[in-house]
Curated annotation (Swiss-Prot):
UniProt membrane topology term: Single-pass type I membrane protein
Keyword vocabulary terms for this entry: Calcium, Disulfide bond, Glycoprotein, Golgi apparatus, Hydrolase, Membrane, Protease, Serine protease, Signal, Transmembrane, Transmembrane helix, Zymogen
Active-site residue numbers: 213 (charge relay system), 251 (charge relay system), 422 (charge relay system)
Protein name per UniProt: Kexin
SUPFAM superfamilies with a match to the protein in the record: Galactose-binding domain-like (SSF49785), Subtilisin-like (SSF52743)
Record-linked InterPro entries: Galactose-bd-like_sf, Kexin/furin, P_dom, Peptidase_S8/S53_dom, Peptidase_S8/S53_dom_sf, Peptidase_S8_His-AS, Peptidase_S8_Ser-AS, Peptidase_S8_subtilisin-rel
Gene3D superfamilies xref list: Galactose-binding domain-like, Peptidase S8/S53 domain
Domain P/Homo B: 498-647
Species assigned in the record: Candida albicans (strain WO-1)
Length: 938
């Protein structure tokens, strides 16, 4: 048992508010202890946690609960403890896994049985997207004439605009005239086009952007008024105030100034200068994945946007992604943030472009939950440092061509050297503040839709743009274009929210093909035409997406396993059914790793708006331009679609731990079984009601078996391991109208196949086969006719004065239940009596109360069956429509007859006749209308 004091402490900690929990986290002793995270099933009770602490007391020390994730708890273990020999990740990251170490088998098995997952928490350091050094800035010269008359005229207009805006809004900030990203005086039009929104008083009111960075100088005169302390925390020094402490802790403050620098007389002005900023400090020292996860959702009820200008090192060598618990935290952010509308995560694409780096090798920027922002300079050109990839959604302004972003700095200074994609991300975050201020009801996916649909394409001659399914242009360099604040905000004002998210996972596609280059092999002239390419594809059907409730594509991901002797020489792309190409892996000359890609996920936003239906092709190829030996083994891959749901009411909550490929297979199998069950039941009913002899029933059952054997699951077919198809293309893409039609179509197909397979048979054999098929075909037509007559009788009412009335003897008929064939006019007087005898109005058998001898009942049944069959045959083959006044069966008018009977019983005989005449005239008109409707349908 746990000591009472410890038990009280644990319960008190778990019940304390979130802020108090952060304040109660004890200091970490990484020198003497290892830390790990345990996931326990404590959703309904804290007993599993209490039991775990009690059981492992003396082995592991309880530290604290992870506030960002339910059911996750931090423990520590002394580095000298023997359990360190097998302790590792379990149901978590796919490295440093738990090992069933010799001598600790029982300890291993026991620990695994107690927990749902274990995550090791080693120290790590995240890298800032630091501004590119000025001496390394690429100065791009173009053919623009800075001294031309047109340019002078344009700049004169820009100066006049600047003066007017400053006067109207009373702007006196000394650096405002140098903030070209707000009003570009030298290259007019190459700015974020925000001043029109300012004049409309759209200034970011009510929106808070968290700078997940190295701190924010909340004491700066340019920041203080717009600083939000509730959304702030220092994870490096464990405190409420995220003030910069190190000499290079200026990054977050500069980013904050871009967004929300106050309109005053200090430095410049923020793009959303009435919004607020908070600081979440994580980049000023080593942290663990639990700290990072906490940071990504800290102040989730306060912060709307999380601006992140950091990630793996931008050196063209690193392949890195967030740990599983960080991914879980981001999923929590988009599911629970902003009152369930979802927090907005904005990431800088990276500054490794000059090293050949790509943002698809960065698991933060290629997350579907991130808006990845690249950079353009003040001329609108693509800087060399800005990383391009298929995950880039938009670009906005930053340093390049000798110019930088002018913003607030630490120590009461102003900065004129802020740049890189780390300056582009907060500028975009400020624009998203304006968007949310104008329309706070947008979800996280709506913000991405607005980015895709209202960004402005730029440098169309440079970016290898492709036209997408939405008739939008997409470039790996520029995404869907630059952020035009005025255009995007006004687009967002009238935006109607999309339906909730849905997703599709394919099966894992085994490839296991190898490419090997040799020194003697001649190198190709272009990267896009390598001598060897491994091809694979997956066919996504309409049925696949429908069963998973997916209407259209937003993001696609490709999870791969590729072994390589030189990772930087591997290239990969995916081609959609519409022909849009996403470059997933590009060559990186500095990446000489031999680890390849192990369960690595690439992402693309280039296919936004596609249906997803059709063949998705992947190509893996090698850079053999060096003339040395490189080997690539493409083992397997999995294709995933994330998009809008068909039916929002059926939308689910995404769980990263679930295997949605297995769920899809289960749903398809369940639907298949239900379809078989429905078809079998319908076929059996048809055989019973239309066949008087045993031979007819056998024929119908046989036809049903034929249909069952020809139907196949229309799930995704894997091109690399193709199987023989058992259905025609029409069966795959056209819905089945009825069982009878299916039987007929199947029989026709079987007939055609039989003719092809038996070309050498004699004429007698062919005649016999044709005769059998003709009989079955006629029977199918009869069944169709029978069903059509039933439907007509079910849904078309007839007048109450017809000749055919319900008989009073109470006998039952299988085909037309509850109908009266009597010509008597006094049937209304006996309606209540007949209703008392009948307690069901369903088609089929009734619960009759009369006792009739078996022989009498059988004779009556046979007679009625013969009469009914003759009538059906006459009606079906008639050249004119029946007289609905006299010959139409009457279903569903019992209540009307009952009411008429009650009125007739109360009224005098003479008035009864008048009423009957009037009613008959009304019903004659109704019958004429019904007659017209039937003629139209026929």
């Amino acid at each position: 048992m746990l000591p009472i004091k410890l038990l009280i402490f644990i319960l008190g900690y778990l019940l304390s508010p979130t802020l108090q929990q952060y304040q109660q986290i004890p200091p970490r002793d990484y020198e003497n202890k290892n830390y790990f995270l345990v996931e326990l099933n404590t959703t309904n009770s804290q007993k599993p946690l209490i039991d775990f602490i009690s059981h492992y007391r003396g082995h592991y020390n309880f530290e604290h609960q992870l506030s960002s994730l339910d059911n996750h708890y931090v423990f520590s273990i002394d580095k000298s403890h023997p359990h360190n020999s097998f302790l590792g990740n379990h149901n978590s990251n796919e490295y440093n896994l738990m090992k069933r170490q010799l001598g600790h088998e029982q300890d291993y098995d026991e620990l695994i049985s107690h927990v749902e997952s274990i995550h090791l928490l080693p120290m790590k350091k995240l890298s800032k997207r630091i501004p590119v050094p000025i001496e390394m800035e690429d100065v791009v010269f173009d053919n623009r004439d800075d001294t031309g008359s047109d340019n002078h005229e344009a700049t004169d207009e820009a100066h006049q605009k600047l003066i007017e805006i400053a006067k109207k809004l009373d702007i006196h900030d000394p650096e405002f005239t140098t903030q070209w990203h707000l009003i570009n005086l030298k290259y007019p039009g190459h700015d974020v086009n925000v001043t029109g929104l300012w004049l409309e008083n759209i200034l970011g009111q009510g929106i808070v952007t968290a700078l997940v960075d190295d701190g924010v100088d909340a004491e700066s005169d340019d920041i203080k008024q717009n600083f939000n302390s509730e959304g702030s925390w220092d994870f490096n020094n464990k405190g409420k105030s995220p003030l910069p402490r190190l000499f290079d802790d200026y990054h977050g403050t500069r980013c904050a100034g871009e967004i929300a620098a106050v309109k005053n007389d200090v430095c410049g002005i923020g793009v959303a200068w009435k919004s607020q900023v908070s600081g979440i400090r994580i980049l000023s020292g080593p942290i663990t994945s639990s700290d990072e996860a906490e940071a990504m959702v800290y102040g989730l009820d306060t912060n709307d946007i999380y601006s992140c200008s950091w990630g793996p090192t931008d050196n063209g060598k690193v392949l890195s992604e967030p740990d599983v618990i960080v991914k879980k935290a981001m999923i929590k952010g988009i599911q629970e943030g902003r009152d369930k509308k979802g927090a907005i995560y904005v990431f800088a694409s990276g500054n490794g472009g000059r090293f050949g780096d790509s943002c698809n090798f960065d698991g933060y920027t290629n997350s579907i939950y991130s808006i990845t922002v690249g950079a353009i300079d003040y001329k609108g050109l693509h800087p060399q440092y800005s990383e391009a990839c298929s995950a880039v959604m938009v670009v906005t302004y930053s340093s390049g061509s000798g110019e930088h972003i002018h913003t607030t700095d630490i120590k009461k200074k102003c900065s004129a050297t802020h740049g890189g994609t780390s300056a582009a991300a907060p500028l975009a975050s400020g624009i998203y503040s304006l968007i949310l201020s104008a329309n706070p009801n947008l979800t996280w996916r709506d913000v991405q839709y607005i980015s895709v649909l209202s960004a402005t394409p730029i440098n169309e001659e440079d970016g290898n743009y492709q036209t997408t399914a939405l008739n939008r242009k997409y470039s790996h360099k520029y995404g869907y274009g630059k952020t035009d604040a005025y255009k995007m905000v006004h687009f967002a004002k009238t935006w109607v929210n999309v339906k909730p998210q849905a997703w599709y996972y394919s099966d894992i596609i085994e490839v296991n093909q190898t490419i090997t280059t040799t020194p003697e092999q001649k190198a190709p002239s272009k990267r896009d035409s390598p001598q060897k390419i491994i091809h694979s594809s997956v066919n996504v059907s309409e049925k696949d997406l429908k069963i998973m409730n997916v209407e259209r594509v937003e993001h696609i991901t490709v999870k791969v396993n590729i072994d390589s002797t030189y990772r930087g020489r591997v290239g990969m792309r995916i081609i959609s059914p519409t022909g849009v190409i996403s470059d997933l892996a590009t060559f990186r000359v500095n990446d000489a790793s031999t680890r390849g890609f192990q369960n690595w996920t690439f992402m693309s936003v280039a296919h936004w708006g596609e249906t997803g239906i059709g063949e998705w092709k992947v190509e893996v190829f090698v850079d053999d331009s060096k003339g040395d030996q490189v080997e690539i083994n493409f083992k397997d891959w999995q294709f995933r679609i994330f998009g809008e749901s068909i039916d929002g009411d059926k939308a689910e909550v995404y769980d990263i731990t679930k295997d949605y490929a297995a769920i899809r297979r289960e749903l398809l199998e369940k639907e298949k079984q239900n379809s078989k069950s429905t078809t079998t039941t319908s076929s059996t009913t048809t055989a019973t009601t239309t066949s008087g002899g045993e031979g007819d029933q056998k024929t119908t059952t046989s036809a049903e078996n034929k249909e069952s054997t020809t139907k196949v699951d229309n799930s995704a077919s894997i091109t690399t391991s193709q199987t023989a198809s058992l259905t025609s293309s029409n069966e795959q893409h056209q819905p089945t109208e009825s069982n009878s039609d299916s039987d007929s179509d199947t029989d026709d197909e079987n007939k055609q196949e039989g003719e092809e397979d038996n070309d050498n048979d004699n004429d007698n054999g062919n005649k016999k086969a044709n005769s059998d098929n003709t009989g079955f075909y006629l029977m199918s037509i009869a069944v169709v006719g029978f069903i059509a007559v039933l439907l007509v009788m079910k849904f078309h009412k007839t007048p109450g004065s017809g000749r055919r009335r319900r008989r009073r003897d109470g006998y039952e008929f299988d085909i037309i239940p509850g109908e009266d064939y009597s010509d008597s006019d006094d049937d209304e007087d006996d309606f209540d009596t007949r209703r008392a005898d009948d307690d069901s109005f369903d088609l089929g058998h009734r619960n009759d109360q009369r006792v009739v001898s078996a022989s009498q009942q059988q004779r009556q049944y046979d007679r009625q069956q013969d009469e009914t069959r003759d009538r059906l045959f006459d009606d079906f083959n008639a050249e004119s429509l029946p007289d609905y006044e006299n010959d139409m069966f009457k279903i569903g008018d019992e209540e009307e007859e009952e009411e008429e009977g009650q009125q007739s019983a109360k009224a005098p005989s003479n008035s009864e006749g008048n009423s009957g005449t009037s009613t008959k005239k009304y019903k004659d008109n109704e019958a004429d209308e019904d007659h017209k409707d039937v003629v139209g349908t026929q």
